[in-house]
Amino acid sequence: MNHATTRAAILPEIIKLIQAQYGLSEDEALHAFYTSAPGASFADDETGLYGQSPNYIFGLFLQEQREREPQ
C-alpha cells in the first residue's frame, strides 16, 4: 500500500475523532487537523506519521490543542 492510500484509509478515523471531541463539522475538523502540526506532518511522507494509528495521531492533535489553550 502506498503512502497516499494509507493516509486515505486512516484520515476518516482521525477526522471522526476530532468531530466527536470538539463537536465540529467534517469540514471544520479537516481544517483544524490540516492546520495543526500533526496534520502537516501527516501530509509529509518524510515524517512517516502516516504509518501510525489514527488514535496515536489524534493524541498528538489533542496534545497540541491543549498546549494552545490559555491557562
Task: Name the predicted role of every residue range.
Residues 1-71:
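C-terminal alpha-helical interaction appendages
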